Amino acid sequence: MRLIPLQTSEQVSRWAARHIAERINRFQPTADRPFVLGLPTGGTPLQTYKELIRLYQAGEVSFQHVVTFNMDEYVGLPKEHPQSYHTFMYRNFFDHIDIQPQNINILNGNTEDHDAECRRYEEKIKSYGKIHLFMGGVGVDGHIAFNEPASSLGSRTRIKTLTEDTLIANSRFFDNDITKVPKYALTVGVATLLDAEEVMLLITGYNKALALQACVEGSVNHMWTVSALQLHKRGIVVCDEPATQELKVKTVKYFTQLETQAIQSVL
């Protein structure tokens, strides 16, 4: 696992966006050989999306031959709802780049058969071979996507009941009214994420410090699904200084020395 300890969330976003752009450009995707990118929603990746848009506008990256798969979507929330993840992705990213509409994949939380929708999603991912890079965020309780604590580390795309902690955290997007937050979501599984060629997690803020500690220093544990990243051969965690507060000093120093070049690239 790589841990890239930066100073600020702005540096985290800038490094992550540049890494994505570099991966796409190095891959040299074509219509017959697209680059497959996994994407999250939420507050953490917002600045990364803004930076990717800036790189696109500067002519430094194109999404013409990029296929995307989003992590999750609420169940029962219309696509047009202002807080649906469909709306989030188009408003904050897709509407501002040259991605082809047919290359955008987001789970449909309004189908009559959720199990069938989840199977379809898994098959669609497999049809491209693999996801080349999956970017993600992390919840305060260490969940990745909507794989809440005690989720199976071998799980696949499925419907999940959201925990009270998640409902409270997400209520800020619903007028701070927890009763308005959907209670269920469709989400890729932990194993789905681990199947990706590379997984990059963005962890920022004091409130994510325990999750970062569990990810980097803890044991692999289904109560902290983020810890499953330890099993991945190409896992990257990009964090800011506040998120490192629960890590051992020697851990931060170790990775700071290892990642000197990466750190200097955003200074």
Swiss-Prot record:
User: Coiled-coil stretches, from where to where?
Assistant: none
Keywords in UniProt for this one? Allosteric enzyme, Carbohydrate metabolism, Hydrolase
Q: Which Pfam family, just one, is annotated for this protein? A: Glucosamine_iso
Site Part of the allosteric site — annotated at 151, 158, 160-161, 254
Q: Which reaction does it catalyse?
A: alpha-D-glucosamine 6-phosphate + H2O = beta-D-fructose 6-phosphate + NH4(+)
The activity regulation comment is: Allosterically activated by N-acetylglucosamine 6-phosphate (GlcNAc6P).
> Looking at its record, which EC class is this enzyme?
hydrolase
Q: Where is the active site?
A: 72, 141, 143, 148
Q: Which GO terms describe its molecular function?
A: glucosamine-6-phosphate deaminase activity; identical protein binding
Q: Does the keyword Hydrolase apply?
A: yes
Q: Which InterPro entries match?
A: Glc/Gal-6P_isomerase, Glucosamine6P_isomerase, Glucosamine6P_isomerase_CS, NagB/RpiA_transferase-like
Q: Which GO terms describe its biological process?
A: carbohydrate metabolic process; glucosamine catabolic process; N-acetylglucosamine catabolic process; N-acetylneuraminate catabolic process
Q: Where does this protein act, in terms of pathway?
A: Amino-sugar metabolism; N-acetylneuraminate degradation; D-fructose 6-phosphate from N-acetylneuraminate: step 5/5
Q: What is its EC number?
A: 3.5.99.6
One GO cellular component term noted in the UniProt record for this chain: cytoplasm
Query: Could you confirm whether the keyword ATP-binding appears in this record?
Result: no
Identify its protein family.
Belongs to the glucosamine/galactosamine-6-phosphate isomerase family. NagB subfamily.
Q: How does it assemble?
A: Homohexamer.
Function statement = Catalyzes the reversible isomerization-deamination of glucosamine 6-phosphate (GlcN6P) to form fructose 6-phosphate (Fru6P) and ammonium ion.
HAMAP family annotated for this entry? GlcN6P_deamin (MF_01241)
Record protein name field? Glucosamine-6-phosphate deaminase
Q: Which organism is it from?
A: Actinobacillus pleuropneumoniae serotype 3 (strain JL03)
The gene coding this protein: nagB
